[in-house]
Amino acid sequence: AKTITITSAEKASRVSLRKMLPFVKAGMPIIALQAGMGNDIICLFDTGCPSFFSLKESDFDRLKTAGAFQILAEGYGEGSIGVAGMAMADTSLRVQFPLLSVGGTKFQNVTSETSTPPFTLLGVKLLDYGKVTLDYPRARFYFEAYEPEYDLASKHYNVALRVKDGELIISTVWTSMKGVVEVGDKVTKINGKPVGTYDFCESIINGILELK
């Protein structure tokens, strides 16, 4: 089960401080992650972001200079979804971080797409790998990972999908599919089978079953 605990002002969390990251900004779960060795990324933990990690373009520019990731592909589509809503449509880059650390937990081969939200986002898929505790009164973020290290290497599709009004639509088109499909096209079949009706919130929390 995906678990987030919110602590009260009266009672501090019992989770070890070794699993704690302080909020960079009081009142919001904005924390500092490490990309590779010595590259800080300030990011917002945002359960409205359906991916594991979404990279703000200004952070992309800074980390590119530091060689913190590899560029995998270029695409065009809708911006990322988060607490601030959906970002403007724009060109997006898909990158891969060889190493991204959330406190003491190491994530290898982390794929991210660039977007234009106010912050780089650490999304809801973090909860696949551990429990999160948010202590707003003390400005603390705790992550209790199930394992000390994860390899997130995975296959990549040439289009990205999202749910709109119960239907699957194409939200991003990557390099090899440009000119074949367009952003906003409706998906009617996956692997030859007609698609069903989808719940937007369920798709963010658990993904789209047919694509797993």
Please report, for each region that a protein language model flagged, where it lies by residue.
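Pepsin/retropepsin-fold aspartyl endopeptidases
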Residues: 1-212
